[in-house]
C-alpha cells in the first residue's frame, strides 16, 4: 500500500437523522460537504420504538438523501461505530439531484430485512421536530464514550436511541 492509498476518501449516502447538519457535524467532528442525491430500489422505514430510520431493499423504492463527501477513514469509523452491527455498510449507486450524474457511494442498510419492527415511512421533518434534541444528546454521549469508554459498554449507550427506553422502577 502506498501512502496515497491511505489518504483515499469515502463518499457516504445518508438518509434519516444523518441528513441533519448538526448531527453529522457532531459525529464526524467536522462539517463535510453534503450533496443532495437519490437512492433507487430502497425504502426508508421507521423502526418501532427507535429514534432513527433504516433502509431496506424495495423494488419501487426511492429515497431522497445526501452524500457526505470526502470522509476520512476515522470519520467512516465513527459512522460504523454509531450504526453498530444492526446495519451493513454496502456500496450502492445514487443519482445526484442537481446533475442526474450517477455515483458509486457507500450507505448503511438494515441488516435484517425481515425485521418485524420495520414499518411505514420515516419522516425527516417529524423526526426533527420531535426527536432531534434527544438524538443529539445520545450522539454526544456516544462520541464522549468513544473518546473515553471508562469500562462502559457500547450497549449502555444504545438505549439512548430508543424512543421510550425502559426505566428502573
Swiss-Prot record:
The active site is at residue 83. Expressed in roots, leaves and stems. Induction: Up-regulated by biotic and chemical treatments. GO terms for cellular component: cytosol; plasma membrane. Substrate binds at residues 15-20. Keywords: Acyltransferase, Transferase. GO terms for molecular function: acyltransferase activity; protein domain specific binding. Its EC number is 2.3.2.-. InterPro entries: AIG2-like, AIG2-like_dom, GGCT-like, GGCT-like_sf. Putative gamma-glutamylcyclotransferase. Belongs to the gamma-glutamylcyclotransferase family. This is Protein AIG2 B. It comes from Arabidopsis thaliana. The lineage of its organism: Eukaryota, Viridiplantae, Streptophyta, Embryophyta, Tracheophyta. The gene is AIG2B.
Amino acid at each position: 500500500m502506498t501512502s496515497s492509498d491511505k489518504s483515499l476518501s469515502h463518499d457516504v449516502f445518508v438518509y434519516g437523522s444523518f441528513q441533519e447538519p448538526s448531527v453529522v457535524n457532531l459525529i464526524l467532528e467536522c462539517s463535510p460537504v453534503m450533496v443532495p442525491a437519490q437512492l433507487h430500489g430502497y425504502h426508508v422505514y421507521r423502526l418501532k420504538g427507535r429514534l432513527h430510520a433504516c433502509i431496506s431493499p424495495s423494488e419501487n423504492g426511492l429515497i431522497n438523501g445526501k452524500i457526505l463527501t470526502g470522509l476520512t477513514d476515522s470519520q467512516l469509523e465513527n459512522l460504523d461505530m454509531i450504526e453498530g452491527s444492526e446495519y451493513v455498510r454496502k456500496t450502492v449507486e445514487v443519482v445526484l439531484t442537481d446533475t442526474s450524474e450517477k455515483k458509486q457511494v457507500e450507505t448503511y442498510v438494515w441488516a435484517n430485512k425481515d425485521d418485524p419492527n420495520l414499518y411505514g415511512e420515516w419522516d425527516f421533518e417529524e423526526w426533527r421536530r420531535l426527536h432531534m434534541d434527544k438524538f443529539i444528546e445520545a450522539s454526544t454521549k456516544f462520541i464522549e464514550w468513544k473518546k473515553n469508554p471508562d469500562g462502559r459498554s457500547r450497549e449502555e449507550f444504545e438505549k439512548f436511541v430508543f424512543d421510550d427506553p425502559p426505566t428502573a422502577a
